[in-house]
């Protein structure tokens, strides 16, 4: 999840102003002078003396909103009736609800959907648990599980504050892929307790999406759940980012005419997303990846307390380079940032190989300002929606879960992730591909179905799909 910005800072100001004292042009001028942009005007009421209007204003941030309101307060004859943040209005009462698929209008309806008729369905599932997939919501339902410890851009804000993010995630599952998802925010940071809770609720779900759980706990939680459950478990902060990154890189390399096996990649931020990005790149065929964290390049001559870094050192940096980001980036074809704002300098970009590719994905502020980097890079991507080539997990998780659910996959394996990345990349045609369009829009209607199909094929190919014809049971007339 990215921090709010842009259109998310729209506010609606209800103003009452006296016609004989002030004109609307005075109001518009004050808003513009304070830095606001009027995007909508609605007349609520009008009389000989007063006019009441709702003015929707776009602002950069909350400070600018305050400046706009203060400017309006200073205008004689203007009264501020109310100020509404449109983003907050969308969240009142939560963003999702449960709907019934079958109307219950008669006693007969009631007896079939609940007692006594439901007992026959329960018995059928007890006799053959596979029928849970055909007779309950399990086959199309995903749990979005978080403890609120690593909400991107906000950090450890806890389970209550994480709920709006998880509700939003559930909405996107439904809107983009028709998957019913439910947010589950846990009031515990204990790794073992989280594992046991998720295992206990798993019978109701066809998949588990782990979200915004801090590293290194997220690695152990996902690993254990994948081992102990027979449904897909997917930590989106790791693998969703990795899949979309690879999709973008595949297309970027076409533009610069380079191959995965020949490139040098420097990656900053060896946390959950950084490690997952590295692993998918290695699986795709990249041979030379150098991971850099705050202490410099990860190399084999160092003993790290973090066991994941120790493993990382064995898998990467074939030349065992040492030093800072600035030291190791010389000659790099690709920079990938999942770290912190402003750590990549223009001087670093100048040291890179010809036609450098930069994925600066820190949110809300990338590792380098795209406008500063633009003269020196061939392809630039960020995690932001206000620049071209946004690396957005929404391109991945709806389609990858849609495919996994449709074939009843036991897991989402590396081959399925690779297939998803290639499918996303394929949505951008050869005619469309250019430096500012290496990745499709999240609203491209082809994405989910293309990913779904590729994931299903990979699941069958690797033997993790279990879709078969399960008899529903009950009287069939035969």
Swiss-Prot record:
GO terms assigned for molecular function: malate dehydrogenase (decarboxylating) (NAD+) activity; metal ion binding; NAD binding; oxaloacetate decarboxylase activity
Co-factor(s): Mg(2+); Mn(2+)
Sequence ranges assigned to domain ACT in this UniProt record: 12-86
Regulation: The activity is enhanced 5-7 times by ammonium and potassium.
Binding residue positions for NAD(+): 270-273, 363, 393
Catalytic activity: (S)-malate + NAD(+) = pyruvate + CO2 + NADH; oxaloacetate + H(+) = pyruvate + CO2
Entry-linked InterPro entries: ACT_dom (IPR002912), Aminoacid_DH-like_N_sf (IPR046346), Malate_Decarboxylase (IPR051674), Malic_enzyme_CS (IPR015884), Malic_N_dom (IPR012301), Malic_N_dom_sf (IPR037062), Malic_NAD-bd (IPR012302), Malic_NAD-bd_bact_type (IPR045213)
Pfam families for this protein: malic (PF00390), Malic_M (PF03949)
Signal peptide limits: none
Co-factor note (free text): Divalent metal cations. Prefers magnesium or manganese.
Active site (record annotation): 114, 169
Annotated binding of a divalent metal cation, by residue: 211-212, 237
Domain of life: Bacteria
UniProt keyword list: Metal-binding, NAD, Oxidoreductase
Enzyme nomenclature, EC number: 1.1.1.38
Class in the EC hierarchy, top level: oxidoreductase
Subunit structure: Homotetramer.
Family of this protein: Belongs to the malic enzymes family.
UniProt function note: In addition to the NAD-dependent oxidative decarboxylation of L-malate, the enzyme catalyzes the decarboxylation of oxaloacetate.
Further information: This enzyme has a higher affinity for NAD than for NADP.
Protein's recorded name: NAD-dependent malic enzyme
Annotated organism of origin: Geobacillus stearothermophilus (Bacillus stearothermophilus)
């Amino acid at each position: 999840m990215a921090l709010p910005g842009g259109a998310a800072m729209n506010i609606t100001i209800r103003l009452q102003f006296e016609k004989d004292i002030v004109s609307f042009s005075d109001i518009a001028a004050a808003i513009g002078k304070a830095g606001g942009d009027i995007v909508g005007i609605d007349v609520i009421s009008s009389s000989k003396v007063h006019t009441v209007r709702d003015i929707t204003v776009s602002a950069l941030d909350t400070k600018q909103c305050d400046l706009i309101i203060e400017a309006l307060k200073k205008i004689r004859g203007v009264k501020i009736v109310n100020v509404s943040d449109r983003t907050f209005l969308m969240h009142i009462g939560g963003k999702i609800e449960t709907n019934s698929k079958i109307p219950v209008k008669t006693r007969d309806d009631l007896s079939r959907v609940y007692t006594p008729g439901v007992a026959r369905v329960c018995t059928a599932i007890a006799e053959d648990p596979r029928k849970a997939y055909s007779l309950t919501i399990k086959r199309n339902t995903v749990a979005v599980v978080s403890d609120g410890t690593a909400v991107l851009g906000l950090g450890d804000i806890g389970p209550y504050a994480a709920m709006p993010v998880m509700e939003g995630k559930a909405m996107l599952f439904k809107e983009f892929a028709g998957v019913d998802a439910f947010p589950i925010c846990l009031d515990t940071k204990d790794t073992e307790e989280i594992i046991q809770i998720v295992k206990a609720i798993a019978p109701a779900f066809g998949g588990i999406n782990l979200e915004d759980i801090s590293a290194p706990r997220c690695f152990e939680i996902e690993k254990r759940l994948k081992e102990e459950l027979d449904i897909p478990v997917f930590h989106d902060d790791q693998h969703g980012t990795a899949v979309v990154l690879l999709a973008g890189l595949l297309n970027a390399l076409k533009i610069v005419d380079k191959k995965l096996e020949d490139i040098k990649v420097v990656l900053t931020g060896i946390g959950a997303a950084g490690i997952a990005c590295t692993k998918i790149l290695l699986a795709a065929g990249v041979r030379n990846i150098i991971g850099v964290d705050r202490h410099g390049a990860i190399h084999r001559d160092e003993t790290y307390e973090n066991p994941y870094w120790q493993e990382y050192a064995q898998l990467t940096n074939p030349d065992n380079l040492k030093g800072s980001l600035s030291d190791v980036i010389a000659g790099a074809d690709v920079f990938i940032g999942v770290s912190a704002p402003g750590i990549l300098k223009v001087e670093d970009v100048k040291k890179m190989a010809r036609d450098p590719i930069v994925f600066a994905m820190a949110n809300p502020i990338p590792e380098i300002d795209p406008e500063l980097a633009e003269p020196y890079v061939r392809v630039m991507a960020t995690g932001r929606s206000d620049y071209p080539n946004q690396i957005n997990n929404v391109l991945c998780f709806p389609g990858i879960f849609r495919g996994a659910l449709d074939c009843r996959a036991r897991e989402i394996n590396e081959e399925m992730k690779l297939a998803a990345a290639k499918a996303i990349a394929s949505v951008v045609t050869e005619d469309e591909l250019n430096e500012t369009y290496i990745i499709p829009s999240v609203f491209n209607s082809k994405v989910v179905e293309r990913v779904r199909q590729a994931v299903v094929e990979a699941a069958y190919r690797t033997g993790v799909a279990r879709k078969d014809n399960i008899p529903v049971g009950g009287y069939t007339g035969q």
